[in-house]
Amino acid sequence: MKRLIAILCALGLGACAPAGQVQRLDAQAGATTPIAAYNPGRPDPLPAARPNAEMVRDFLELGFAMESGRGIERFSRFEGPVRVAVSGRAPGTAEADLDRLLARLRNEAGIDIARLPAAAQPDSHAGNLITVEFLPRRQMQAVVPSAACFVVPNVTDWSDFVANRRSPLIDWTRVVTRTRAAVFVPADTTPQEIRDCLHEEIGQALGPLNDLFRLSDSVFNDDNFQTTLTGFDMLLLRVWYSPELQPGMTRDQVAARLPTLYNRLNPRGRGHAGQTPGITPRAWQQAIEQALSSDGGATRRRAGAVRALSLARTQGWHDSRLALSLMLSARLAPRDQGAEALNDLLSAAELFRASPGGEVHAAHIDMHLAVQALANGQSDMVLELTQRAMPIAARTENAAFVASLAFIRAEALALQGRAAEADRLRLDSQAAARYGFGSEAAVRARMDEIARIGAAARQMAAL
């Protein structure tokens, strides 16, 4: 499953913070302080922007394989209305985020899905059921150490999963008609991390079980830049639940129906053959996973990034796979390779801007460039880069990204002597920051990290 790394990488070109470094909520770190309301506004997902022929290939690759590479012989889905039950101690923002997600699935994917009434007992519900259970992270990782959140078929709660964790009952490749699934989410992490888990895991409970690094426009991608279900994802789910498809179909049977379905549901994607990405070697995927992993330290991660870039160039790619390889190589490069890293980062941004959904990745690169500009006292450049990135961060509802950009921008304003504007921007960003980083202590740590860069720039300017 996803959540290998945090959505935001550590500031600067030299490192990328893994998810394990995101501060968790606890009583000593302000977890009991009410979180200001973060309001992302009306959902405005990035649209499906690729030719239908490409998305047909993506559907088949996502739908007929597991993340591990194991094949899935038969198409599977729920038949009929799906209901969602919540159990455990759901954090304050989680249920509102769940309701927002379910409304999007109804409106954008056309799926009949809704919450069970709070008083209803999941065990008494005879229909299709997805249970979302909130648990302490420690309890989850004692059983599944590598997963931050995940979804399991044919169980209704944690005890049911633990009792059957070595049983073929929970083997997704054996499921044809889905009737029950349980999503397990840590209750003691940030609101944004919880929201992101809900989007991907419920998306997988309903639809595809695979992730593809080359899909820059999808949450079904372990690079973690898309944090909520995109237009591509919603279109895929709408096709997934079209009446022309039925559980038990083979890959060839589904493939025969997909072009007509996509052309009907996405008329603007008609008539273009699109690009054929070719096979992505498993060795490249493993190298990317190593570069993104929190295990093994910086040296091992850097080696993974270098190997991924070498493999991408050997393959002759000029798509999001090369862009991701360049980006990770730049972020993990040692300080004495700063010039080469900058060139790689700029090349990655150019490739991402030419890729559907890649504007999100390019906006993250703008943030990294803004940090470098701030360190050099180039306040005008900081304001230009952050202004370009902020609409994408807001549109994709990435609160941590929004807050980080605002804090960087505030330091640039302070460099220009616009202290009142800087203070107002920091204050206005607190709701997004608390949602994205979780606790007051975590917000303060991020603000202080950026403030130190701004302070150093002011000291240099005073010399």
Task: Specify the residue positions occupied by each region the protein language model found.
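Metzincin-family zinc-dependent endopeptidase catalytic domain
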Residues: 96-199, 204-205, 209-215, 323, ...
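TPR/TPR-like (Sel1-like) alpha-helical repeat modules
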Residues: 346, 384-391, 417-437
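Metalloprotease/metallohydrolase-associated module, dominated by Zn2+-dependent proteases
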Residues: 18-26, 67-69, 156-181, 185-193, ...
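Disordered inhibitory propeptide/activation segment of secreted metzincin zinc metalloprotease zymogens
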Residues: 17-83
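C-terminal motif of bacterial Sec signal peptides marking the signal peptidase cleavage site
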Residues: 12-15
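Structural signature of alpha-solenoid helical repeat scaffolds
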Residues: 317, 356-357, 397, 437
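Helix-turn-helix repeat elements of alpha-solenoid scaffolds
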Residues: 280-281, 292-310, 334-347, 378-388, ...
